[in-house]
Structure formats: structure tokens, C-alpha cells
Amino acid sequence: IVPVKDNPEVDFTTPTEVGKNVENFSNEQIKFANGFDFNWVLNTYKDGKVDDTKVAASVVSPETGIKLEVFTNEPGIQVYSGNFLNGKITGKNGKVYEKHAAICLESQHFPNTPNQPEWPSAELKPGQTYKSHCIFKFSVEK
């Protein structure tokens, strides 16, 4: 786990444009992944518990004002920035999706959890039930 403080390329604790000039980032993980494909520990996760009444993540389109807020009971969120979109997918109104034309926010446990006993367990034993929820709330900012 790498702290985001003093690491502006991955610090989204305040509103920040995602991926501006991502090809020029110096972060080795961003270079290796060809963009964002990381898991962030959510601020809603404290002392082994998640406060799912608080916004875990949010994004806003500066062009349309469309806002997405994510609420989850998971401790982490995987952020993927469409690193391998290549212009071969066409969307609404003929919009062609080029590299980094999209962002995914996936609530989940942390990768490598089985090998990190101090992290929240993702182990599911016979007879147990796993319950996870993720709410995507859309609105428009004016």
C-alpha cells in the first residue's frame, strides 16, 4: 500500500482531473499499466469496518456535469482508465472510444488479500454467504 499524500498522480483526496497527460506520468505502476488500473483503500474504511453511508468515490464530467457517486460496503475500489481502448468500439451517437476514453470504478476487496493477513479477508468458507453492495448514484451538477 502506497500513501497518496505527496503523490499527485494518484492522490484523489481532493477534486482532481483524472488522467490528464497520463502518458507523461512518472509513476512506474501507471507506466506499466498504460494508465490507471489500481486499487485504492477507501477513506470510508476504518478500523476494519466500512461506512457505506458515505461517498466512497465520485467523478464528474466537466463537459456535461454528469456526476457519479459510489457507495459500497467494500474496503477498496479498483480504478481502470480504459487503457486498452483502441478506437474499435463505437458508442452512443457514433462516439468512438479511444484510449483512456472511459473510467471504471469497481468496489472490491484489495488484490492479494489472501496473502496479507492484516487486510480484510476475502475468504468464503463452506456454508457462509458473501454479501456485497455497490450503489451508483447519478446526478447532474450545474
List where the protein language model places each region.
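Carbohydrate-associated surface elements
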Residues: V2-V4
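Active-site pocket scaffolds in enzymes
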Residues: E9-K142
